[in-house]
Amino acid sequence: MLRSSAITQGIQRSPNRAMLRAVGFNDNDFNKPIIGIANGYSTITPCNVGLNNLALHAEASTKVSGAMPQMFGTITVSDGISMGTEGMKYSLVSREVIADSIETACNAQSMDGVLAIGGCDKNMPGAMIAMARMNIPAIFVYGGTIKPGKLDGCDLTVVSAFEAVGQLTSGKITEDKLIAVEKNCIPGAGSCGGMFTANTMSAAIETLGLSLPYSSTMAAEDKEKIESAERSAKVLVDAIEKNIRPLDLLTKKSFENAIAVVMAVGGSTNAVLHLLAIARSSGVDLCIDDFERIRQKVPVICDLKPSGKYVTVDLHKAGGIPQVMKLLLDAGLLHGDCLTIEGITIDESLKNIPSEPPANQNVISPITKPIYKKGHLAILKGNLATEGCVAKISGIRTPVLKGPAKVFESEEDCLDAILKEQIQEGDVIVIRNEGPVGGPGMREMLAPTSAIVGQGLGDKVALITDGRFSGGTYGLVVGHIAPEASVGGNIALVKEGDMITVDAHKKLIQLEVDEKELSKRRTLWEKPEVKYKTGILGKYARLVSSSSKGAVTDQP
């Protein structure tokens, strides 16, 4: 029996049917599945500006496939626009709002399935969390990646603009060049074009089996993206008939597959946070140490920005995520028996994919000739992060750094010091009170890290924080330090000039202060005053878990 029969069947549901008739239902529609189309369309950001067209095509395809679509909106936040401002505190919060809104609409209206369409970073994990909670047949349609901008024969992304700020302040470029980068780095619709957070999470969702093959790397403005949205609707209607549900796909093995692909493509640190959160909603026992275990086995085989050369549309041309998955599968690094939304296994889905990457490209390397022999997202532990933290270590020349702490209580204070050239080679920059509770909202530190890179210090300093990093960040950066400063983590006890060791080889992050001194400082530490007592940020700060647990708000 369809779940929607609760609102469509029986004499007592005559008023319900009357409402449905007013939005287009006819007599013969009340026995059809009702599919919610969660539309993240927004003119706030280029990531989402093209979504309505995809939603309309998915809606039409749903009808043709024998189901009844009901479209509703959900929010988005533009990380790129809010970056470096107080507004960025709402970014991670929006993941929870998106999840809550999709769950609310679908469950309130007794929908039989949901097709979610998203573009910007938090759209993907937000939709996945909702799908896992509801466990009704579901599929995700990614809005697509942006094509690269061009200037002087070079590919540009939004990160180019952030780095240009640092280049300008250090005298490496003129203001005219900065404006030229600004005008050319984002040429149209789509999510930020490197293997940043949005493209990382879309790749993870494709690997998990909840979006169609190749769909995670398509360009937003290409015709195949429309065709993919239409086909997604048909596949979802079929999944309802077969009763294929998200929790049939979201297993420990499938999450291990997703982590492996994130490592192979050189994906964002945010994947750690989001996959932990999705797993929690799925009832899957995934922990931060699983990322380190898989990192040790899976090499980086894709040369993608931010630390590499190419952008996501180049990956698509080279074979996309299916090609990456095939290489991992043949190497024994992927579980082939995991189910996909199409009702077939990973093995079956990849059976016709070549066992070697195309010879006429340099985006995907053979598994035997990786770009890096191990994954790039290392989990470090030590007295500065007893619950762990995440370091992005690909493309860095300084995997070990011991230096004096430069301590900042906010992102703004740190950026000001960087732009005033107060950061020296060998420094360990500490930005604290930016965690899930302390921010609140765990802002991304793209502005400081890009300014550092722009000044030529990207491989000469380390930056550690209880906040997050954008998927566009590279260099020796360590985020998600847990416990965070605002709940009394040892990062709160760091003083200016303390020596800190960051050792990616030993997976160590250590404050070189003895326990006796730390205990003394701990007794003197005072919990910071709550920054937001009301509104969504106040509510979030009261509810949110540690970043080591995914920074979720629906913990029992």
From Swiss-Prot:
One of its GO terms (molecular function) is dihydroxy-acid dehydratase activity. Keywords: 2Fe-2S, Amino-acid biosynthesis, Branched-chain amino acid biosynthesis, Iron, Iron-sulfur, Lyase, Magnesium, Metal-binding. Coiled coil: none annotated. Pathway: Amino-acid biosynthesis; L-isoleucine biosynthesis; L-isoleucine from 2-oxobutanoate: step 3/4; Amino-acid biosynthesis; L-valine biosynthesis; L-valine from pyruvate: step 3/4. It comes from the Bacteria. Homodimer. This is Dihydroxy-acid dehydratase. It comes from Prochlorococcus marinus (strain MIT 9211). The lineage of its organism: Bacteria, Bacillati, Cyanobacteriota, Cyanophyceae, Synechococcales. The gene is ilvD.
